[in-house]
């Protein structure tokens, strides 16, 4: 390391770039892992060598103490150091790549090394939508905070709220006088950032100002515990084997209804709604959709943590399609877990989402794939894999569903039903009898000498009509 430093030192001195040289010196000091500001009885070779170098650098006692107290550095100091480090590493990598190409000195081995280095830098520092930024690439051993404050802040518009994280315990009036450590549009992004960067551990106490949200301390603590359980820190070291291949998702944690109450009216009245309709996508006689949002937190093989948010009435379907498309694209199904800690029916909601993802994955990623019928409230969704991508056909009501089922098909395509779709209806029983190459006829006698006849053809289409009939025997003849 010292030999390498001497080469870099000569180069930067010749170019008169003292700031870059100081960064290299700080990196070498951190790598040496000695604390020269503290007296010690040990006079090992490493300490003696670093003392000699530090005298050459003209570092004073104050600078040594600052470097030796890195464990006390907080987010601000670490972020500033990281920004300079990222800028220098990126610049050096680009220069090295361009120099090698322009001078024709890159052989096959060097090309592989450069590729791995580029991917390592990309994984560690590249910024992209949804990616959780890592602010502490080994600069300080510990960024954890004993006390934090989490608050929802309102913007200019009614829907322009954001979430901010502050150091220490602050009251609501004190928030305006402090600069947040980080703020994000959505809560899951912020807590994922706090976890990935080690600001929050099991000992951290967080004061919560939920604003207009339904977030409670109970929910927040459980969300953080779920992140610690599924993405324990430190993450395993990134290997050359992993970097030599394209990144692929390894683990996915679905956080459902973060900071939301799916049944706010019953909560306000302190009531518990009991119904035989327990499906989270069609709850109670009103068939309420209790899945209001899903935040998908995914760790890939390059140790990148990403958060994707889906919200609104189609949140569950959109999250499901995103998961299936990525699993099919990478030919790999990431380990999936679901967590929900909202006020009403949280366990049932989490179980429902996990079952749905498992069932849909089994049907749509099979070879050959099946179509998948899902009922959300009183509407229906048909999921079908076409050209490697999950396609959605939305049908507003049962009449449109029956027209879809009766449309002619070019080839046999089995239709799998979600466990809650068409519950208690004979249509579901018929569709489950579908067989390639078989034509099946079903009938039901109705009042006023009428009969309902259903034909399930050899390609999986279901056609239905009504006609007059005198009795069952006449109908069958």
Regions found by a protein language model. Give the residues of each.
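Structured mid-domain segments that build the active-site/substrate or prosthetic-cofactor binding neighborhood
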Residues: 1-17
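Short, hydrophobic/amphipathic alpha-helical patches that form generic packing surfaces
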Residues: 6-9, 22-37
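C-terminal subdomain of alpha/beta-hydrolase-fold enzymes, centered on the catalytic histidine
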Residues: 22-25, 51, 73-80
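Extended, well-ordered protein cores
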Residues: 34, 43-48, 52, 432-433, ...
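Structured alpha-helical bundle/scaffold domains in large eukaryotic membrane-trafficking regulators
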Residues: 39-43, 65
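Eukaryote-specific, cytoplasm-facing alpha-helical/coiled-coil scaffolding segments in long proteins
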Residues: 49-62
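Long C-terminal appendages of very large multidomain proteins
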Residues: 56, 91-477
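Eukaryote-biased recognition of C-terminal alpha-helical segments
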Residues: 65-108
